[in-house]
């Protein structure tokens, strides 16, 4: 454990700070639920590695990372932050006689395969009950069979586990069992070397919670708002309006209607390829993202709420506005954070590398 530099050199440029490496100011973290790795933060250099870890090409986290890696130039790394899931439900998707059904369960204490062979008179109930009998003695996971479903629940909240299923079994959509503040506290305790944050959830409560958390940290949160109300200037209860009314300097949002596109991840990747202060977040082309068709009235409503758009202009699609929810330019916030960290590190290096710093002109 190393002491914090600001004990010796404390630099304040309007915003508070925590330590990030130079590389970290160009690193994106995508946050979402998954059961594919035990680590809170996993670093990937391409999407193929995500498939090897058990992600599916239809998973939101995969799609978000794919939009980031699709940009030119592409990022060297993208980090995936895991939200804790404490319970899941597994069901039989294909009932067959004399067939093997396999679940691989891993915790930090070890990995175990559970394989059940169905009888000549197989049913979903007998298969689930057979798997439950095999898994019942697990030290960290409670396994119960109910209504043709196998429920796996951690005995202690927060226990990390991964699950891999044979193709004849399926898992219901998983839900996080912790708040976003708890998620981010666990993530930064594991790996704080990132700057951009994206969230696969587009729920209003999740976006507002992460925006609030980000405002107290040296990070930048980008999100998508898909509410039609965001395009209406007379409505002030949509996510975009609420982000503006809270005056969030560290959050920017794009209006986008395609649920499988993550333009915020694409924009992060595109702009993070440029050194802090040398970029603008407007007028950027985004590979792999479908442009929205907006009327001028809708565009003006969005930008009046300090939102951003990705639209077609003749034969090219580009981003528009380039501002945070508080109305500040996104590049100004990133450069300010980078400059603050740069000054602190450089002054600290002078202090430790010189015998004495005289207090003279």
Locate predicted features.
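Extended, beta-strand-rich, solvent-exposed assembly scaffolds of outer structural proteins
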Residues: 46-52, 94-165
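Extended, compositionally biased
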Residues: 66-86, 151-163
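Surface-exposed cap/loop segments at beta↔alpha junctions
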Residues: 83-87, 106-108, 170-179
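Long, acidic/polar, low-complexity amphipathic helices and coiled-coil-like
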Residues: 144, 155-219
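Short, hydrophobic/proline-enriched secondary-structure or compact coil segments at domain edges
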Residues: 29-31, 104, 150-153, 193-202, ...
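A glycine- and small-residue-enriched flexible loop/hinge signal that marks low-structured segments
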Residues: 133, 188-353, 361
């Amino acid at each position: 454990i190393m002491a914090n530099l600001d004990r010796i050199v404390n630099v304040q440029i309007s915003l508070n700070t925590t330590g990030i490496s130079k590389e970290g100011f160009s690193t994106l973290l995508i946050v979402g639920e998954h059961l594919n790795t035990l680590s809170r933060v996993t670093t990937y250099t391409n999407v193929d590695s995500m498939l090897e870890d058990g992600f599916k090409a239809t998973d939101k986290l995969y799609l978000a990372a794919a939009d980031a890696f699709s940009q030119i130039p592409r990022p060297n790394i993208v980090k995936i932050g895991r939200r804790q899931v404490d319970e899941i439900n597994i069901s039989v998707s294909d009932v067959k006689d004399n067939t093997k059904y396999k679940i691989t369960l891993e915790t930090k204490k070890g990995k175990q395969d559970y394989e059940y062979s169905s009888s000549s008179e197989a049913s979903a109930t007998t298969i689930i009950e057979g798997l439950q009998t095999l898994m019942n003695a697990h030290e960290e996971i409670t396994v119960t069979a109910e209504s043709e479903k196998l429920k796996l629940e951690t005995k202690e909240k927060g226990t990390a586990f991964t699950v891999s299923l044979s193709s004849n079994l399926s898992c219901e959509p998983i839900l996080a069992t912790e708040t976003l503040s708890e998620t981010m506290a666990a993530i930064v305790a594991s790996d704080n070397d990132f700057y951009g944050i994206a969230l696969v959830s587009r729920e209003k409560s999740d976006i507002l919670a992460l925006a609030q958390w980000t405002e107290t940290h040296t990070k930048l949160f980008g999100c998508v708002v898909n509410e039609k109300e965001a395009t209406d200037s007379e409505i002030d209860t949509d996510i975009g309006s609420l982000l503006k009314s809270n005056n969030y300097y560290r959050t920017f949002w794009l209006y986008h209607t395609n649920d499988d596109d993550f333009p915020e991840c694409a924009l992060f990747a595109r702009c993070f390829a440029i050194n802090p202060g040398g970029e603008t977040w407007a007028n950027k082309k985004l590979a792999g993202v479908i442009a929205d068709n907006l009327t001028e009235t809708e565009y003006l409503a969005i930008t009046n709420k300090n939102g951003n758009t990705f639209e077609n202009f003749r034969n090219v699609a580009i981003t528009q506005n380039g501002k945070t929810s508080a109305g500040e330019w996104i590049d100004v916030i990133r450069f300010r954070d980078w400059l603050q960290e740069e000054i602190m590190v450089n002054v600290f290096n002078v202090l430790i590398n010189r015998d004495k710093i005289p207090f003279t002109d």
